[in-house]
Amino acid sequence: MKGTIIKGIGGFYYIKIDNSEEIIECKARGKFRHTELTPMIGDYVEISIDKNNKGAIEKIYERRSELFRPAVANVTQALVVFSFKNPDINIDLLNKFLLLCEYNNLKAIVCFNKMDLVNKEDYKDIISMIEQAGYDIIFLNAEKERNMDIIKKLIKDNVTVFCGPSGVGKSTMLNKIIGKETMITGNISEKLKRGKHTTRHSELIYVDEGLLVDTPGFSSLDINFMEKEDLLHCIPEFRDFIGECKFTGCLHHREPNCAVKKAVEEGHIHKNRYDFYIKTLEEFMNRRKKKW
């Protein structure tokens, strides 16, 4: 039988069988321990059931995409959820999430929640930066369901993951979409104005002819598994200019006659995005030096 992993808890995986409402609890075969392949939420798998009615994952089919921390496979799009206030926006963290989406070939849509707390005009430079990078933006108030109809339309025929830091309203958004309190939603700490890590586990849910993954809200994101060569291809607004640089393999850093740096000077690429790229590039280069 074949199906999709919709949940994983304590070494057990719950598989929704194709063309059926049946969900079967399985464990992964021991052979997976000897490989680098570990079952992930969203994996399309083949399973067997023994004479004792115990399920086992026999095969994991090739993944179309992978998202790490949290681990989710075969996602087609990411709703990158942030707020301008409560908690305050962290631009570097937003850029890291977008970077990870690009690395995994995920369509990223930026969702700003809690818009009732702010005046959008006060954040027009941030908004301009994101739009200039080519990302769609949706402005939300999930509690009052403002623009949640747009989110529901996006879900259809997609496998969608909610990404973003703790406390921005990812679980609230999911609750509104599916119409019940599926995940425990924590209150914001008054002292820190940051969310509690209250989402218990990752789970894939069938909603509106699509699949949703609700993921734990992390306040930091590690991208150290990437290399500087990966970084070059994960800033989409660079792509129109890369072939115009004087030097093949230009890192758009200290090289002369760099088309990307010229585009920044002329306002075609937002300076904050370029500064984030340089900061991240230098972190990668320093990490490589330490390895040697």
Swiss-Prot record:
Keyword Nucleus listed: no
Keywords annotated in UniProt: Cytoplasm, GTP-binding, Hydrolase, Metal-binding, Nucleotide-binding, Ribosome biogenesis, RNA-binding, rRNA-binding, Zinc
GO cellular component terms attached to this protein's record: cytoplasm
Residues binding Zn(2+): C245, C250, H252, C258
The protein's enzyme class: hydrolase
Residues in coiled coil: none
Location in the cell: Cytoplasm
InterPro entries for this protein: G_CP_dom (IPR030378), NA-bd_OB-fold (IPR012340), P-loop_NTPase (IPR027417), Ribosome_biogen_GTPase_RsgA (IPR004881), RsgA_GTPase_dom (IPR010914), RsgA_N (IPR031944)
Transmembrane region(s): none
Entry EC number(s): 3.6.1.-
UniProt: GTP binding residues: N113, K114, M115, D116, G164, P165, S166, G167, V168, G169, K170, S171, T172
Entry annotated with the keyword DNA-binding: no
Cofactor stoichiometry and binding remark: Binds 1 zinc ion per subunit.
One BP annotation, GO: ribosomal small subunit biogenesis
Gene3D superfamilies in the cross-refs: Nucleic acid-binding proteins, P-loop containing nucleotide triphosphate hydrolases, Probable gtpase engc, domain 3
CP-type G domain segment(s): 64-221
Quaternary context: Monomer. Associates with 30S ribosomal subunit, binds 16S rRNA.
UniProt record similarity statement: Belongs to the TRAFAC class YlqF/YawG GTPase family. RsgA subfamily.
Chain's role: One of several proteins that assist in the late maturation steps of the functional core of the 30S ribosomal subunit. Helps release RbfA from mature subunits. May play a role in the assembly of ribosomal proteins into the subunit. Circularly permuted GTPase that catalyzes slow GTP hydrolysis, GTPase activity is stimulated by the 30S ribosomal subunit.
NCBIfam families registered for this protein in UniProt: ribosome small subunit-dependent GTPase A
Name this protein carries in UniProt: Small ribosomal subunit biogenesis GTPase RsgA
Designated gene of the protein: rsgA
